[in-house]
């Protein structure tokens, strides 16, 4: 059943496609796209000067991921980690937190595996900071693995310190 203005339209009266004048408001429930590869078509708003490949928003997802942390030299003996992601179309934003409870012999750079989606292009840059000392961090993603290092070419974190990082990339 569809209600338009003060009229109610039953399923048997609905033709495909449905064209309605004005805005559509859902007062309860969700708008569900029931077929893979379909979504919201923005082609009526074409305004880019480049070569367009798609104006269809067909994917949105958010969730959590579990960062698996090691070091490029030696080994970290204990850590806590938490990650979140948002995927809109082909664009993914990852954020994550790592707390080093015991660095062990870890040195070099921090390696983080387990990103939810593989990057289409290697070496997309990330940004982060050491929450404990304020040092800026950088790094990159290759596939689903990230490498984090300190701008000053120092090991990015020590026992008892935490880092927060973020990266946005294309899949």
Give residue spans per PLM region:
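Intrinsic low-complexity, repeat-rich intrinsically disordered segments enriched
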Residues: 1-66, 70-72, 95, 102
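Residue-level detector of beta-strand structural context in well-folded domains
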Residues: 22, 81-83, 137
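Residues that act as N-cap/strand-start positions at coil-to-secondary-structure junctions
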Residues: 25, 77-79, 133
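Generic beta-strand structural signal
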Residues: 26, 35, 87, 140-142
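Surface-exposed ligand/attachment interfaces on beta-rich extracellular proteins
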Residues: 35, 45-56, 64-88, 97-120, ...
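Substrate-binding and catalytic surfaces of secreted/luminal carbohydrate-active proteins
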Residues: 92
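Extracellular attachment/recognition segments
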Residues: 114-150
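Short, structured beta-strand segments at or near domain termini in extracellular proteins/domains
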Residues: 159-171
